[in-house]
């Protein structure tokens, strides 16, 4: 188990970029709200601890984890955010519904990351039982929401740094190759 030997709430503030000027969106599923509220609290507290002003954190609720995709998409389109964290919890039941929801949410959030220029951080627990979710939302393994907030700060910083123009940056062709503008070289003879 990936979190068995790791506390999700631990981070070294000295390794995290300055986040005071970033603006974050958090989209929270209301399904399994005991868990998602714990995850939200972990994310919110970590952002505040990393100097993000509370007024620069926008929260939207959606009914369930599947709706996180649409909520995140609309937040990306309408809010001026540097990153979005999606928070949900899907717990294995007796049917295949768990598999469909987990796959759909995972692919939907992946698609948003591919299609947009703003990072969307995946904080959706997909556990076998309620105890595993409790353990990862402020329990014995810490809080996945905290980990997601730190990831959001780091990704917002990467986005910011990547947008800074450098003289060696060249536009890419649709094939992924560098587009290099040819400039004729004039050789003057004396």
From Swiss-Prot:
| EC top class, as a word | transferase
Q: Which reaction does it catalyse?
A: (2S)-2-hydroxy-3-oxobutyl phosphate + 5-amino-6-(D-ribitylamino)uracil = 6,7-dimethyl-8-(1-D-ribityl)lumazine + phosphate + 2 H2O + H(+)
InterPro entries registered for this protein in UniProt? LS, LS/RS, LS/RS_sf
Q: Does the keyword Transmembrane apply?
A: no
Q: Which domain of life is it from?
A: Bacteria
- Residues annotated for 5-amino-6-(D-ribitylamino)uracil binding in this entry: 31, 65-67, 89-91, 122
Q: What is this protein called?
A: 6,7-dimethyl-8-ribityllumazine synthase
Q: Which organism is it from?
A: Flavobacterium johnsoniae (strain ATCC 17061 / DSM 2064 / JCM 8514 / BCRC 14874 / CCUG 350202 / NBRC 14942 / NCIMB 11054 / UW101) (Cytophaga johnsonae)
């Amino acid at each position: 188990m990936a979190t068995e030997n790791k506390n999700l709430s631990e981070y070294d503030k000295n390794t995290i970029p300055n986040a005071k000027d970033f603006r974050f969106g958090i989209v929270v599923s209301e399904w399994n709200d005991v868990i998602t509220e714990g995850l939200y609290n972990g994310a919110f507290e970590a952002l505040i601890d990393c100097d993000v002003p509370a007024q620069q954190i926008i929260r939207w609720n959606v009914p369930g984890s599947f709706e996180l995709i649409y909520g995140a998409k609309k937040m990306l389109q309408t809010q001026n955010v540097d990153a979005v964290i999606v928070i949900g919890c899907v717990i294995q039941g007796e049917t295949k519904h768990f598999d469909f929801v987990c796959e759909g949410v995972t692919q939907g959030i992946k698609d948003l990351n591919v299609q947009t220029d703003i990072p969307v951080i995946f904080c959706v627990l997909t556990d076998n039982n309620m105890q595993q979710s409790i353990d990862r939302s402020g329990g014995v393994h810490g809080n996945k929401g905290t980990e997601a907030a730190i990831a959001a700060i780091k990704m917002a910083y990467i986005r910011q740094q990547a947008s800074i123009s450098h003289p060696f940056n060249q536009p890419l062709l649709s094939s992924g190759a560098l587009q290099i503008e040819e400039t004729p070289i004039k050789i003057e003879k004396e």
